[in-house]
Amino acid sequence: MKKTIVSTALLLTALSASAVAQTCKYDSIMATAPADRFIIQEKGTILDANTGLEWMACIYGMSYENGTCVGTAQDMDSWSDALMLRDEVNGEEVAGYTDWRLPNVKELASIVEYACFGPAIDLSVFPETPSAPFWTNTPDADEINGGEIPARIIDFTYGTEDFTSTGEKTYVRFVRTP
């Protein structure tokens, strides 16, 4: 009986930890990427009024339907795969455009909402964004040592910028300059 109770408690703890929701601290931290600066387009894109950039509302592998992202997000095993994915996406003319690209690290950081974590992004603007790293097109020049070239990433768990080995699974969100 005691073994069953302990097993049940451990299972419930694990389930509750995996279902942790996003936390935002707008009462103590000013919004860095407020929802009112973004214009949500019916075609599944988001126009950033501050930067002029147009973002895909959904990450690669998902599609935009009825104001949300559906499907299964696909992570990329390598930076080179993420960079080459651009040609595939542009061939599909997503939202009617053929000029999608991986954002640079500063562009991707511009949509981080530092008042939130788990993920550090406004989910009312960018639905279904996981708390995970996302590729940029920016190499990490400080870490080039003759081997694999690491890329700069933004980890949307807390909105941190870092570098990653090109073999780590990471997500992709495309951007374009209208």
Model-derived features with residue positions:
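Glycine-aromatic-enriched surface loops/turns that form tight recognition elements
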Residues: 2-5, 19-101, 105-178
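Sec-dependent N-terminal signal peptides
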Residues: 6-11
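N-terminal signal peptide c-region/cleavage motif recognized by signal peptidases
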Residues: 14-18
